């Protein structure tokens, strides 16, 4: 197989001539699965205890926080010259990404950004794994199970 000219340099870095590679067609989660996920997650957000509800003004904030908490996130750690610089960096980071989870510890700033769940960013298996983990934690936060939450959201739809 010959790579498209646009991807030739990338292929030369990632593959060796003469080696055999397995090609696989990526599978994507169905639209129904994605729609169900967002409906169930919205229902969980609507049922958060008051102290948690204040932290998440929208279900999108809630979803991205959950993704970070269950490990579907990118982490950037930055060591600053001082604790004050770290606090200033955290403020700047917050203005650039209001959904990021930012942790300041002394001179170190850790910025966690939720992984995108678009079909182009996550294949079927990874989406299903993230969906299950996110809904498990969301259900735990409202004192129920993922299955019970999904059934309740299904009846409301």
What do these predicted ranges mean?
Residues 1-157:
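Acidic (Asp/Glu-rich) sequence patches and key acidic residues
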């Amino acid at each position: 197989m010959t790579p498209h000219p646009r991807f030739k340099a990338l292929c030369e870095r990632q593959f060796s001539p003469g080696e055999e590679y397995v090609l696989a067609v990526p599978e994507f989660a169905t639209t129904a699965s994605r729609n169900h996920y967002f409906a169930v997650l919205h229902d969980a957000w609507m049922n958060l205890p008051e102290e948690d509800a204040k932290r998440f003004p929208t279900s999108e904030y809630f979803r991205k926080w959950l993704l970070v908490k269950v490990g579907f996130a990118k982490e950037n750690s930055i060591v600053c010259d001082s604790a004050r610089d770290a606090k200033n960096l955290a403020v700047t980071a917050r203005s650039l990404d209001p959904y990021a989870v930012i942790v300041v510890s002394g001179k170190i700033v850790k910025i966690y950004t939720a992984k995108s769940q678009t079909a182009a960013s996550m294949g079927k298996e990874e989406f299903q794994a993230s969906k299950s983990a996110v809904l498990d934690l969301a259900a735990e936060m409202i004192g129920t199970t993922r299955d019970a939450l999904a059934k309740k959201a299904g009846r409301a739809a």
